[in-house]
A protein has these predicted regions:
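Active-site environment of divalent metal-dependent phosphoester hydrolases
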Residues: 28-32, 56-61, 78-84, 107-112, ...
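Conserved beta-sheet core of the metallophosphoesterase superfamily
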Residues: 72, 110-175
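Helix-adjacent hinge/juxtasegments
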Residues: 72-110
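Active-site neighborhood of phospho(di)ester-bond hydrolases with catalytic His/Asp-centered motifs
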Residues: 23-25, 49-55, 72-77, 101-104, ...
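Well-ordered alpha/beta subsegment
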Residues: 180-181
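Pre-active-site segment of Zn-dependent metallo-hydrolases
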Residues: 27, 31-43, 102-103, 107-119
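Beta-strand-turn-beta hairpins that frame and shape the catalytic cleft
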Residues: 12-22, 92-101, 139-145, 169-177
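N-terminal active-site segment of His-dependent metallophosphoesterases
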Residues: 2-71, 79-89, 160-162
Length: 181
């Protein structure tokens, strides 16, 4: 079972029956991009909070995103000791009665079997992950597995567009959306 640590988010605004979460991963700032693309700030303009699924490379990414909303993040394989010392490998947040897990690389390259195990072991209704730089939405039964892709370094280049994702959560449902930028 993966070790789960918690970051504390400020209390979410109580008003509204739907929470919108901005999902982002694999920003690689400043190694592969000088900054987060401006389009990300437009897409995330009215989110309740932001989830970053790792490979920030520099903590300034969190500072930049926090201009919009609170940020919940995990470290990725390209994040150095400073980031690994501040962020957990696995994180989660409960929105209404939905438990949303965050992890950079839950063996996504080997299919959903390992991701399904992680979701079941941790009681996740949804698992946000990164690492592949390629966006995807997959449902396995009633479990959601979503990769927002990369806004700075999509793979494969020239075929895959830079992307982020939005997750709209209500008491009744979770609705994922990939947004190309």
């Amino acid at each position: 079972m993966a070790t789960e640590q918690s970051q504390v988010l400020p209390k979410l605004r109580e008003m509204g029956s739907t929470k919108t979460i901005g999902l982002i991963s694999d920003t690689h700032v400043p190694a592969r991009a000088r900054e987060i693309p401006k389009e990300v700030f437009v897409v995330f303009e009215s989110v309740d909070f932001i989830v970053h699924a790792g490979d920030l490379v520099d903590l300034s990414v969190i500072d930049d995103l926090e201009q919009l909303a609170p940020v919940l993040a995990v470290y990725g394989n390209m994040d150095g000791p400073e980031i690994r010392g501040k962020l957990p490998k696995v994180n989660s947040v409960k929105v209404f009665d939905w438990k949303i897990g965050i992890m950079h690389n839950p063996s996504a390259l080997f299919g959903t079997r390992k991701m399904r195990e992680i979701a079941l072991q941790n009681g996740f209704d949804a698992l946000v992950f990164g690492h592949t730089h390629s966006s995807s939405i997959r449902w396995e039964g009633n479990k959601l597995f979503i990769n927002p892709g990369s806004p700075t370094n999509p793979v494969p280049p020239f075929i895959t567009k830079p992307s982020v994702a939005l997750l709209r959560v209500s008491k009744e449902r979770i609705a994922p959306e990939i947004v190309q930028i």
